[in-house]
Every structure is written in C-alpha cells, then in structure tokens.
Amino acid sequence: MALNLRKNHQILKIINDALIDLPAPSNISTWWNFGSLLGICLITQIVTGLLLAMHYTADTNLAFSSVAHMCRDVQFGWLIRNLHANGASFFFICIYLHIGRGLYYGSYLNKETWNVGVILLLTLMATAFVGYVLPWGQMSFWGATVITNLFSAIPYIGQTLVEWAWGGFSVDNPTLTRFFALHFLLPFVIVGLTLVHLTFLHETGSNNPLGIPSDCDKIPFHPYYTIKDILGFALMLSLLVSLALFAPNLLGDPENFTPANPLVTPPHIKPEWYFLFAYAILRSIPNKLGGVLALAASILVLFLTPLLHTSKLRSMTFRPLSQILFWTLVANVLILTWVGSQPVEHPFIIIGQLASLTYFTIILILFPLAAALENKLLKL
C-alpha cells in the first residue's frame, strides 16, 4: 500500500486534521464563515503591515512624513496603506459578527474556545489602538493621550503606571517607539492565540444552528467547507478592495490628516468607529474610575455568558423571547456606536446612559430570566 503523505507526515497530518479530513456538521450556515474570514483578515493585515513597516519610521519628527512618503513615493504604497487601514475595519466587522453568532447559537458553551476568543478580542483591540497612534496625526496623538490617561484612574498606582507606559510625562517619542514595537509584536501573539482557539474548537467540534449534537451527521471539511470558505474570501476581499479603492477615507477621521500638535486639541476626540460603543459606555458615567470600570466590563462581561446560560436549549433558534432580546441588544450596540460619535451634549448624554444601562441589563439580567421563562413555557 502506498504511503499517504497527507495522513502520515508529522506536519501535514496536523494541517490535514484541521482543514481537510476534519469532521464538520452538515448544516452549519454562512454565520460559521466568519472564523475563516478572520483568518484571512489576519493574514492580510500581517502582510500589508510588514510591507508598511519596511517604509515607516517610528520617530515623532518623521512618522507623519514617512506615512505621507509611503502614499506618494512607494510603488502602490497608497494601496497597501488603504488596505491595511480598512482591513482593520473589516477585521472588527467580522469579529463582531463572529461573537454575535456565538451568542445567538450558544457556541459559548465550548468554554475554553469562548474564553480564548474573548482574549483574542482584547488583544485585537489593543493591537488596533496602538496601530492607530503610529501615523502621528492629531487624532492619533490625542487618542493615545486620552485612552492611556484612563489608567491614571487606578487608585494609588495609576499615575505611576501611566508615566511608565508613556516613558515620560506626556505622550512623546518613547511612547511612539514602544507602540510601534507592540503593534509589530501583537499580531503574532494573535496568531498563537488563534492556534490555541482552533485546538480547543477541534476538541469538541463545531456547534451548529440547531444547537444539538451532530456526531451522527458529519461531513468532511474538504471539499464542502473549503469551497464555501473560498466564496466568503472572494466576497469579503472584493468588498475590502472596493472600499480601499473607491472610498479609502470613509471610515477615517479628517483630523488625522493634520500632524500631531500637543498645543492644539481637536474639537471632538473620538476613536475609530469599532471602539465607539465602548467609548459611549465610558462617557456615560460621570466619574473617571467608574467610566473605566464600565469600559472594561463592556468587554469582560463576555467571560460571564457561559455562566449565565440558564436555558435547557443551547441555541436561540427555538427561543423567541431570547431572540427578541438578542436583536434588541444588537440595536442597542448600534445606538451606542452612534452616540459615541456625537458630541457630549444634552440628548446624547441621556441616550448614552440609557443605552449603557440597557446593554448590561440585557446581558446580565434579561437573557438568564428569559431563558428560565422559556424553559417553563416549553415545559423543559
């Protein structure tokens, strides 16, 4: 019998078991495509980021000019930069949809996979934040100043911690240098965590839209889901390229076309769109430490979802009350995103506070209550 290299070679065997002969549920929908799309986003970001890093200079006097030089003088530098900047937006679109899928279908009951996923989200947010500082425009500088300053709310050690992170008494050259180092390093940490995430996932196998065990009805990953993933790649990459070519600055802030100036504060300091929901929660509490705790809680609350699952059914497919709550939560996050982009004025303050309260109420109180009620109604 001829030796099958794919199944016997030490390294190829790992790839084979993860991408070719992997038993997958026969009924997973397009919502299960976002994991592989996140993988493509990560590869795209690392490749474009590496090419950008070859031309970038991490110095306060040269950073802004080096980015301008890239866009003007480097072959296709403008395209590489636009793909990288907008690739970050697609990364977050995919991860938010991926998390939404996990919440809806009860995928969080694979606890290890879910917890590693939340750590991945936090790492991605850190990577995007330090990356946004690198072009050294006005919003880069002031965003870095405002967000790093939040750590000063930590009692007793806060101020020391902030000055240690800054490498001085304000955001300056040492800050930019270390942020570049971190922005280069963290994507590789994300790659490592992704492998851990996949390892845990392949221990249990994928969940499916019905939320029931699918061991009795599995199909090989290749060719069925490889072709399905390739369709997803084609759709997402065509959208990314369209955005990068037709409207590259649509999601950016015009303030970042002005070089960083510590003496001039922009009228509205706000992060990129993908952080606005958390920023709105931060702003809705009129106390620095309280705001920081709420900001942290807005993401860390995801760690609690497996513990708050009271339903006898895994998925929300057959749970209409939970479905209504879920879509209310989605609408609520969109409202928070919109409020975060608005100035701190009368209607927006109260809307932000109500939306922040609703966000935590739905996740921590209403989801478990609705699930318990549904158990009763369905006589489970």
From Swiss-Prot:
<dbReference type="GO" id="GO:0006122">
    <property type="term" value="P:mitochondrial electron transport, ubiquinol to cytochrome c"/>
</dbReference>
<keyword id="KW-0496">Mitochondrion</keyword>
<dbReference type="InterPro" id="IPR048260">
    <property type="entry name" value="Cytochrome_b_C_euk/bac"/>
</dbReference>
<dbReference type="InterPro" id="IPR048259">
    <property type="entry name" value="Cytochrome_b_N_euk/bac"/>
</dbReference>
<keyword id="KW-1133">Transmembrane helix</keyword>
<dbReference type="GO" id="GO:0045275">
    <property type="term" value="C:respiratory chain complex III"/>
</dbReference>
<comment type="similarity">
    <text>Belongs to the cytochrome b family.</text>
</comment>
<keyword id="KW-0249">Electron transport</keyword>
<comment type="function">
    <text>Component of the ubiquinol-cytochrome c reductase complex (complex III or cytochrome b-c1 complex) that is part of the mitochondrial respiratory chain. The b-c1 complex mediates electron transfer from ubiquinol to cytochrome c. Contributes to the generation of a proton gradient across the mitochondrial membrane that is then used for ATP synthesis.</text>
</comment>
<feature type="transmembrane region" description="Helical">
    <location>
        <begin position="179"/>
        <end position="199"/>
    </location>
</feature>
<dbReference type="Pfam" id="PF00033">
    <property type="entry name" value="Cytochrome_B"/>
</dbReference>
<keyword id="KW-0812">Transmembrane</keyword>
<dbReference type="InterPro" id="IPR027387">
    <property type="entry name" value="Cytb/b6-like_sf"/>
</dbReference>
<dbReference type="InterPro" id="IPR005797">
    <property type="entry name" value="Cyt_b/b6_N"/>
</dbReference>
<feature type="transmembrane region" description="Helical">
    <location>
        <begin position="34"/>
        <end position="54"/>
    </location>
</feature>
<dbReference type="Pfam" id="PF00032">
    <property type="entry name" value="Cytochrom_B_C"/>
</dbReference>
<protein>
    <recommendedName>
        <fullName>Cytochrome b</fullName>
    </recommendedName>
</protein>
<feature type="binding site" description="axial binding residue">
    <location>
        <position position="197"/>
    </location>
    <ligand>
        <name>heme b b566</name>
    </ligand>
</feature>
<feature type="binding site" description="axial binding residue">
    <location>
        <position position="84"/>
    </location>
    <ligand>
        <name>heme b b562</name>
    </ligand>
</feature>
<keyword id="KW-0830">Ubiquinone</keyword>
<feature type="transmembrane region" description="Helical">
    <location>
        <begin position="289"/>
        <end position="309"/>
    </location>
</feature>
<feature type="transmembrane region" description="Helical">
    <location>
        <begin position="227"/>
        <end position="247"/>
    </location>
</feature>
<keyword id="KW-0679">Respiratory chain</keyword>
<feature type="binding site" description="axial binding residue">
    <location>
        <position position="98"/>
    </location>
    <ligand>
        <name>heme b b566</name>
    </ligand>
</feature>
<dbReference type="GO" id="GO:0046872">
    <property type="term" value="F:metal ion binding"/>
</dbReference>
<comment type="subunit">
    <text>The cytochrome bc1 complex contains 11 subunits: 3 respiratory subunits (MT-CYB, CYC1 and UQCRFS1), 2 core proteins (UQCRC1 and UQCRC2) and 6 low-molecular weight proteins (UQCRH/QCR6, UQCRB/QCR7, UQCRQ/QCR8, UQCR10/QCR9, UQCR11/QCR10 and a cleavage product of UQCRFS1). This cytochrome bc1 complex then forms a dimer.</text>
</comment>
<dbReference type="InterPro" id="IPR005798">
    <property type="entry name" value="Cyt_b/b6_C"/>
</dbReference>
<keyword id="KW-0349">Heme</keyword>
<keyword id="KW-0479">Metal-binding</keyword>
<feature type="transmembrane region" description="Helical">
    <location>
        <begin position="321"/>
        <end position="341"/>
    </location>
</feature>
<keyword id="KW-0999">Mitochondrion inner membrane</keyword>
<feature type="transmembrane region" description="Helical">
    <location>
        <begin position="78"/>
        <end position="99"/>
    </location>
</feature>
<feature type="binding site">
    <location>
        <position position="202"/>
    </location>
    <ligand>
        <name>a ubiquinone</name>
    </ligand>
</feature>
<keyword id="KW-0408">Iron</keyword>
<dbReference type="InterPro" id="IPR016174">
    <property type="entry name" value="Di-haem_cyt_TM"/>
</dbReference>
<feature type="binding site" description="axial binding residue">
    <location>
        <position position="183"/>
    </location>
    <ligand>
        <name>heme b b562</name>
    </ligand>
</feature>
<feature type="transmembrane region" description="Helical">
    <location>
        <begin position="114"/>
        <end position="134"/>
    </location>
</feature>
<feature type="transmembrane region" description="Helical">
    <location>
        <begin position="348"/>
        <end position="368"/>
    </location>
</feature>
<dbReference type="GO" id="GO:0008121">
    <property type="term" value="F:ubiquinol-cytochrome-c reductase activity"/>
</dbReference>
<dbReference type="GO" id="GO:0005743">
    <property type="term" value="C:mitochondrial inner membrane"/>
</dbReference>
<dbReference type="InterPro" id="IPR030689">
    <property type="entry name" value="Cytochrome_b"/>
</dbReference>
<keyword id="KW-0813">Transport</keyword>
